Amino acid sequence: MSKADIIVGIQWGDEGKGKVVDKLCENYDFVCRSAGGHNAGHTIWVNGVRYALHLMPSGVLHPRCINIIGNGVVVSPEVLIAEMAQFENLKGRLYISDRAHLNLKHHSLIDIAKEKLKGKNAIGTTGKGIGPSYADKINRTGHRVGELLEPQRLCEALMKDFEANKTFFEMLEIEIPSAEELLADLKRFNEILTPYITDTTRMLWKALDEDKRVLLEGAQGSMLDIDHGTYPYVTSSSTISAGALTGLGLNPKEAGNIIGIVKAYATRVGNGAFPTEDKGEDGEKIAQIGKEIGVSTGRKRRCGWFDAVAVRYTARLNGLDALSLMKLDVLDGFEKIKICRAYEYKGMEIDYIPSDLENVQPIYEEMDGWDKVFGIKDYDLLPENAKKYIARLEELAGVKVKYISTSPERDDTIIL
């Protein structure tokens, strides 16, 4: 019996998980998404071609991989169908859990309207309706992908939901669709998606029993976890390794190696605490060189220096076996590079994450920069200062680096 390896982001998302999964996919039979929705975005470059994935597992770019969208994901049929249109021959290579919850048009309308009502206190959601979808799930009023197999019954259930919440929709100035319009959409979803809907948990159990190689692909980052992130400026699902298991119906004994994906610096989209944010020239330089624009939202990411306190925290949360250090090349040409080794908090120096992270100040150490690592594939060819930087990050995080990315391209990766 084999075990499922897990890839998790250990900052605030956008760490480069897509490239790592894409690089590793050739060694796996199954690649699985466990949580989130189309608020997540993976960017993968192959032979100069850019692929932006939101719901599809990154294994879709490898013909031999079977791709699974698990029960913990909230699925927008509209977005998924559009994404599927980019690829050929998906039958037999893509499966969607019948237990995954649906993310429909009214969810995004609710999301956008509620953010507007919050004004300056807005969380900074993607507006994709992910929170409202998970809220329906927790309230036990949601609908699941398996219900698409009976579109007429699902339409009737949704219309009853809309009628029961009519006052709420009117308050938010959201127009309720007609039954005819809704049924037409559901029938279209049914026609296209039915061949892909199945019990993916049983499929994965069978795969592990048969010693197939399985990779679980996390979405977003551990600092956005609903329980352990910078609440309330978090996502609506579990983004840590334990959540990857529950989002696919696997138990803790079925976890294999856990790899944490981390940028050589730090970024964040949306509002919330970000201790190492640099609002000056260095932050702007990182943003421009790193092309730090959100894949799902098109929003500019906030940029700053590597936060070793946060990474040490998320490394423990996830039980990491190794790190994959991404976008090291973005720091090419910086004369000095900062690392946050601790925080100042209420007059004390601390090395942990308090629940009120917005009240800390970073304590930095500086290291000398380097000229160029771009495109290097051999560790021995890295500049000495880059090697020293990597070694210091390992020391502060308490986890060894196994992979180093030196460009957006799939093959520009050092494996240690």
UniProtKB/Swiss-Prot annotation:
It catalyses: IMP + L-aspartate + GTP = N(6)-(1,2-dicarboxyethyl)-AMP + GDP + phosphate + 2 H(+). GTP binds at residues 13-19, 41-43, 301, 327-329, 405-407. Its EC number is 6.3.4.4. It is found in: Cytoplasm. The active site is at D14, H42. GO terms for molecular function: adenylosuccinate synthase activity; GTP binding; magnesium ion binding. GO terms for biological process: 'de novo' AMP biosynthetic process; IMP metabolic process. Its cofactor is Mg(2+). CDD domains: AdSS. It comes from the Bacteria. Plays an important role in the de novo pathway of purine nucleotide biosynthesis. Catalyzes the first committed step in the biosynthesis of AMP from IMP. NCBIfam families: PRK01117.1 (NF002223), purA (TIGR00184). Belongs to the adenylosuccinate synthetase family. This is Adenylosuccinate synthetase. It comes from Campylobacter jejuni subsp. jejuni serotype O:6 (strain 81116 / NCTC 11828). The lineage of its organism: Bacteria, Pseudomonadati, Campylobacterota, Epsilonproteobacteria, Campylobacterales.
